[in-house]
């Protein structure tokens, strides 16, 4: 298929494609110059020329294969591309006269420069063509914007009317509605008009690659829109018949979902209840432990208090005993004091009586 497409579609070659890259030996081009040279030099030149020819043939074959692959890919991606066949380029290259071996070296040296320039020029041309194609597409869209908007509005209005009619009929009847022929033909007529207008404008412009590509893309988009419209109409016809069943299925699905949610919530509640019972048991255990600790602390405190009270009682009893002893000793001391006073008084009396006796005796003696 690819070869047939390549043979049928013309291809455009680069303006440097006709440069002679492959050439034969120097004996064919200039037979009279090599007669005066030595045999050894001719043999070395012949071997070098054969090796160069083989290398050039390989390069040429590789280039032809690459060009053919690129053309096949272009034909597969873009069905209509103006290109020339690679066979014509090859024939033109073979028809050119063969160059001298001295010129071959210079051409080989300059070939890379020529190729770079060719690539730059082709890239610049490609960018310019892209810009032109984009500008043309924008201009076409702006020119026919009103027509596109009118077509879209009519299609949307027809869709809305059909949906309303189908809803009304669905309320009274379950059978689906069909699209009217007038609406269908009107949409087909509008799409055909848009296609004709786009095709006429594209023919008026230059028949370049990118313009045709834009036309193909526009046509494909219109076809896809038409297909979508047809699928929507057919879908709306079938939807009215299946809406009731879908509602029933949705209700059943909702009921099942609610049941599943209830079961899941019941399981969660049961888990929470189990957790609560476990925590209650732990709380009771902790409470009992705390009560035991309180009792132990209270008992320890009571023991300490009882010991202190006993010590206080003992001290008080000792104090009482000591006070009693002190009082008794104080009373005995007072008694002793009184006795001493009495004795002192008696001594004083006794001494006074003895002095009076002495005085009387002294008087008597005198």
Curated annotation (Swiss-Prot):
Family: Belongs to the GKAP1 family.
Modified residue annotations for Phosphoserine: 23, 25, 27, 106
Main location: Golgi
Gene name of this polypeptide: GKAP1
Subunit details: Interacts with PRKG1 and IRS1.
A single GO BP: positive regulation of insulin receptor signaling pathway
Organism (species): Homo sapiens
GO annotation, cellular component aspect: Golgi apparatus
Role: Regulates insulin-dependent IRS1 tyrosine phosphorylation in adipocytes by modulating the availability of IRS1 to IR tyrosine kinase. Its association with IRS1 is required for insulin-induced translocation of SLC2A4 to the cell membrane. Involved in TNF-induced impairment of insulin-dependent IRS1 tyrosine phosphorylation.
Annotated stretches, region: Interaction with IRS1: 1-95
Family annotation (InterPro entries): GKAP1
Keyword Phosphoprotein set for record: yes
Biased composition (Polar residues): 39-50
Protein name: G kinase-anchoring protein 1
Location in or out of the cell: Golgi apparatus
GO MF annotations in UniProt: identical protein binding
Coiled-coil boundaries: 47-77, 128-160, 243-353
């Amino acid at each position: 298929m690819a070869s047939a497409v390549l043979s049928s579609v013309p291809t455009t070659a680069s303006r440097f494609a006709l440069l002679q890259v492959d050439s034969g030996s120097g004996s064919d081009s200039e037979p009279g110059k090599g007669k005066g040279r030595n045999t050894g030099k001719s043999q070395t030149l012949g071997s070098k020329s054969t090796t160069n020819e083989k290398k050039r043939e390989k390069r040429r074959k590789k280039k032809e294969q690459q060009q053919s692959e690129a053309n096949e890919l272009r034909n597969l991606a873009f069905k209509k591309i103006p290109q020339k066949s690679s066979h014509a380029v090859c024939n033109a290259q073979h028809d050119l006269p063969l160059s001298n071996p001295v010129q071959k070296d210079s051409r080989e040296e300059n070939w890379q420069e020529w190729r770079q320039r060719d690539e730059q020029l082709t890239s610049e041309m490609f960018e310019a063509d892209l810009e032109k194609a984009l500008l043309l597409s924008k201009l076409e869209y702006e020119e026919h914007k009103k027509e596109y908007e009118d077509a879209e509005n009519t299609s949307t209005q027809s869709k809305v009317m059909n949906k309303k009619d189908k809803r009304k009929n669905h309320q009274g009847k379950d059978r689906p509605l069909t699209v009217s022929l007038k609406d269908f033909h009107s949409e087909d007529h509008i799409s055909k008009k848009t296609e004709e207008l786009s095709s006429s404008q594209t023919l008026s412009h230059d028949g370049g690659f990118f313009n045709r590509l834009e036309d193909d893309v526009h046509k494909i988009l219109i076809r896809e829109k038409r297909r979508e419209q047809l699928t929507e109409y057919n879908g709306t016809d079938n939807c009215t018949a299946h809406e009731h069943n879908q509602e029933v299925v949705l209700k059943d699905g909702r009921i099942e979902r609610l049941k599943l949610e209830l079961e899941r919530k019941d399981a969660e509640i049961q888990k929470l209840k189990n957790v609560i019972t476990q925590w209650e048991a732990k709380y009771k255990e902790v409470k009992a432990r705390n009560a035991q600790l309180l009792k132990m602390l209270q008992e320890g405190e009571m023991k300490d208090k009882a010991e202190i009270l006993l010590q206080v009682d003992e001290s008080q009893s000792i104090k009482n005993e000591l006070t009693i002893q002190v009082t008794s000793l104080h009373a005995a001391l007072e008694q002793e004091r009184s006795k001493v006073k009495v004795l002192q008084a008696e001594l004083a009396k006794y001494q006074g009586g003895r002095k009076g006796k002495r005085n009387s005796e002294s008087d008597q003696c005198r």
